[in-house]
A protein has these predicted regions:
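Cationic, low-complexity basic patches in intrinsically disordered or flexible, solvent-exposed regions
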Residues: 7, 11, 17-20
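Conserved beta-strand hairpin/beta-sheet module of binuclear metal-dependent hydrolase folds
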Residues: 29-122, 224-238
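Active-site metal-binding loops of divalent metal-dependent hydrolases
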Residues: 47-48, 101-104, 137, 164-165, ...
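Active-site metal-binding motif and surrounding structural segment of the metallo-beta-lactamase
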Residues: 93, 109-160
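Residue-level marker for buried hydrophobic side chains located in beta-strands
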Residues: 97-99, 133, 159, 234-236, ...
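Metallo-beta-lactamase
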Residues: 113-124, 128, 155-214, 263-270, ...
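Histidine-centered catalytic micro-motifs
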Residues: 132-142, 215-222, 283-290
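Cap/insert and terminal regions of metallo-dependent hydrolase folds
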Residues: 230-313
Length: 313
C-alpha cells in the first residue's frame, strides 16, 4: 500500500470532532454569495468544511518547520488545516448549472454535507438544476449526487464528469484495495445515476460557456473548467490545489490525497503559470470563502489574491 493510498482511506474515515450544538451567538449568516458574471450570475453556496488535521500529514516533501513558517507568515494556525467546500451555481441562458455536490449524507464528514440546506437558503430547488458538473469522483465532490436512499438528488439534471474518472473509481476491482473507501462511495453515488451521466472530453465546450480542461494528477481524469460569459472568464480549479498558501507557494510539493503526486505537482505548476500569465480569475473549491480571486507569480511560486467581497450593491 502506497503512502498516497493509505492517506486516501485515512481521509475518508478520519476522526473529526463530533458536531456540537452551538449557542445562538455562534451561528453565522447563511453561507451564500452572489457574483455578477458577464451576462450571467454566479451564486456560491457552502457545503461546510473539512478538517485535515496536522498539516504535515497532508503536505509532503516539505519539513514541518517550513510548513509552520509558511502558515505563520499568513497568520494561519499551524496545528490543524481546515479547508472549505464551496459549490458554484452558474445561472446562464435560463439554465442552472451546479459545479460539484459536496459530501452528501456521508457520516465520514461531520462538518460538511450542508449543500441542500445552503441551496434552500439561496432559494434554489434541486429540481431546478439542469446540469451537475463534477471535476472528479472523490466523495467530497460527488457525494451529494444521491440522497440517503440512493435516489437522484437533482432529478432533472444531466451529470457531467470525465469518463476516465468514472471508469476508474467505479471499478469493482478497487473494492477491498487500499482505495476501497473512495471507490465504494463513488459506486454508491455514480452508479444509481449512470443513465444521466454524460462524459466530458478535454478541450470541449460541453455546455454553453463551459469548457473542460483535463488536469490529471490528483486523479486520472481530474478536470478544470473555464467559464466564459460576455467579456469575463473564470477558471474552476477543482482540486488542482487544496490550499491557498502551501500548494501555491510550493506547487510541486506533494499532497497526500493526490493519486499521482508527481504528475499532480507538474500539472499544478503548469496551470498556475497559465492562469498567472493570462490573469484569469479563479475559483478554488477548497479556498477560503468565497474562493474567488487571482494568482500571480511570486518568489518562484505563486500567491493567491482574493477578490474583494461586496455585500451591499
Amino acid at each position: 500500500m502506497s503512502t498516497s493510498d493509505k492517506s486516501i482511506n485515512q481521509w475518508a474515515g478520519m476522526n473529526q470532532p463530533a458536531k456540537q450544538s452551538e449557542p445562538l451567538f455562534m451561528i453565522q449568516s447563511p453561507p451564500i454569495y452572489k457574483l455578477p458574471f458577464g451576462d450571467a450570475q454566479i451564486i456560491l453556496v457552502s457545503d461546510g468544511t473539512l478538517a485535515l488535521g496536522s498539516p504535515e500529514k497532508s503536505f509532503r516533501g516539505i519539513s514541518k518547520k517550513e510548513i509552520d513558517a509558511q502558515l505563520s507568515r499568513h497568520f494561519l494556525p499551524t496545528d490543524n488545516i481546515v479547508i472549505e467546500e464551496t459549490v458554484l451555481v452558474l445561472m446562464s441562458g435560463g439554465k442552472r448549472i451546479l459545479f460539484e455536490t459536496g459530501t452528501g449524507v456521508s457520516p465520514l464528514y461531520p462538518h460538511a454535507g450542508h449543500l441542500q440546506t445552503s441551496l434552500a437558503e439561496a432559494g434554489i430547488d434541486p429540481a431546478s438544476i439542469d446540469a451537475v458538473v463534477c471535476s472528479h469522483a472523490h466523495p467530497d465532490h460527488i457525494g451529494g449526487l444521491s440522497t440517503a436512499n440512493r435516489r437522484p438528488q437533482f432529478p432533472n439534471a444531466q451529470i457531467y464528469i470525465s469518463e476516465i474518472d468514472f471508469n476508474f473509481w467505479t471499478d469493482a476491482k478497487l473494492l477491498g484495495s487500499p482505495l476501497d473507501r473512495f471507490a465504494a462511495l463513488a459506486r454508491e453515488n455514480l452508479l444509481p445515476v449512470r443513465d444521466r451521466i454524460v462524459f466530458i472530453k478535454d478541450g470541449h465546450e460541453f455546455l454553453p460557456g463551459v469548457q473542460a480542461m483535463l488536469t490529471p494528477g490528483h486523479t486520472r481524469g481530474h478536470t478544470g473548467f473555464l467559464l466564459t460569459s460576455g467579456n469575463q472568464s473564470l477558471y474552476l480549479i477543482g482540486d488542482l490545489s487544496h490550499h491557498h498558501v502551501l500548494l501555491l507557494e510550493r506547487p510541486r510539493i506533494s499532497f497526500a490525497y493526490d493519486l499521482d503526486p508527481t504528475k499532480a505537482g507538474d500539472t499544478r505548476a503548469k496551470v498556475l503559470d497559465m492562469l498567472s500569465t493570462d490573469r484569469t480569475a479563479i475559483f478554488g473549491y477548497h479556498f477560503p470563502w468565497p474562493g474567488v480571486g487571482h494568482v500571480a507569480r511570486q518568489h518562484g511560486g505563486f500567491r493567491y489574491f482574493p477578490k474583494p467581497t461586496r455585500w451591499i450593491t
